[in-house]
Amino acid sequence: MKNYKPEKIYIEKDAQDFPHTKKILSLFPAVPVEIIENSKQLIAAAKNHPDPTGSSKRSLLLKNDKGRSFKPFPESEPYLSCDYFTLHLEEGCDLECSYCILQAYLTNPFLTLYVNVEEILENLQKILNDNPDQFFRI
């Protein structure tokens, strides 16, 4: 993602005033910006494109994480749990690897950055403080 430059930036309305949003916009001053109420309709519309993942990767979506950022690593029965946790600060990838299972697995085809980073890290710190005897692998 070293040289990534989006063709368009979408910002959910409740994410537009965060410092990270302003920083990202300052990095791409010439890129068109569209403020949206929420990303559900945007994502649904993108899925109707002949190449939803490829076309959406050219856009950047800025939004707030709504409390899902720290969670157990997804697993399925009958596999043993690895006891890992994931911390989501972003979703997606700008690469086009044809073998990538994530292109079919992810429900959001856009490159997405969660801009409420301070809140995410505060929530993580609270979880760690509330569980001092638990070992977390993140």
Sequence positions of predicted segments:
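Local cysteine-cluster metal-coordination motifs and their immediate loop/turn environment
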Residues: 88-105
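A structural signal for short, well-ordered beta-strand segments and their strand-loop junctions
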Residues: 10, 34-35, 86, 98, ...
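Short, glycine/charge-rich beta-strand/loop segments that flank catalytic centers
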Residues: 39-42, 84-91, 117-119
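Flexible, acidic/Gly-rich N-terminal and inter-domain linker regions that tether
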Residues: 1-83
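Conserved Radical SAM active-site core
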Residues: 63-79, 102-138
